[in-house]
């Protein structure tokens, strides 16, 4: 029973992740004409999406994104999120620092996959 609940929650989380679109996913279609999109196979379209997501102006994982919080790169199917924290230095001055990292949902999904793999392989 517990295993069934676990996999149903995991399945719903993966469906949610796959169906959620970012603005970049919607804007990708503007780079291609409609005829080009019809002519591309799924593999070619996926490669084009990955090439577009690796553009030079995106911020890689664990790099600072304080000035550009929406420019974090994508990795595989998931977009990094800019997570911020307040840091107090030696002079008791508060500054906000941000870095591109996986969101909480992505961390939970990745952990669920790892646990699922461990359960299946045993």
UniProtKB/Swiss-Prot annotation:
Q: Which UniProt keywords apply?
A: Antibiotic, Antimicrobial, Disulfide bond, Immunity, Innate immunity, Knottin, Membrane, Secreted, Signal, Target cell membrane, Target membrane
Disulfide bond residue pairs: 58-73, 65-82, 72-100, 84-98
Broad class of where this protein is predominantly found: secreted
Using the record, list the residue span of the signal peptide; answer none if the entry has no such feature. Answer: 1-20
Function recorded in the entry: Potent antibacterial peptide with anti-inflammatory properties. Inhibits both Gram-negative and Gram-positive bacteria by disrupting both the outer membrane and the cytosolic membrane of bacteria. Also downregulates the expression of pro-inflammatory mediators (cyclooxygenase-2 (PTGS2/COX2), nitric oxide-induced synthase (NOS2), IL-1 beta (IL1B), TNF-alpha (TNF)) and upregulates the level of anti-inflammatory cytokine (IL10) by inactivating mitogen-activated protein kinase signaling in a lipopolysaccharide-stimulated murine macrophage cell line.
Notes on the domains: The presence of a 'disulfide through disulfide knot' structurally defines this protein as a knottin.
Name of this protein: Lycotoxin-Pa4a
Species lineage = Eukaryota, Metazoa, Ecdysozoa, Arthropoda, Chelicerata
């Amino acid at each position: 029973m517990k295993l069934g609940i676990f996999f149903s929650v995991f399945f719903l989380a993966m469906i949610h992740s796959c169906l959620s679109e970012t603005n970049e996913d919607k804007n990708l279609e503007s780079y291609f004409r409609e005829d080009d999109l019809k002519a591309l196979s799924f593999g070619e379209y996926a490669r084009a999406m990955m090439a577009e997501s690796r553009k030079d102006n995106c911020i890689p994982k664990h790099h600072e994104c304080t000035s550009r919080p929406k420019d974090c790169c994508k990795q595989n199917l998931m977009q990094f999120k800019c997570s911020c924290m307040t840091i107090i230095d030696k002079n008791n001055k508060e500054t906000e620092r941000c870095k591109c990292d996986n969101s909480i949902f992505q961390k939970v999904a990745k952990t669920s996959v790892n646990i699922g793999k461990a359960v299946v392989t045993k």
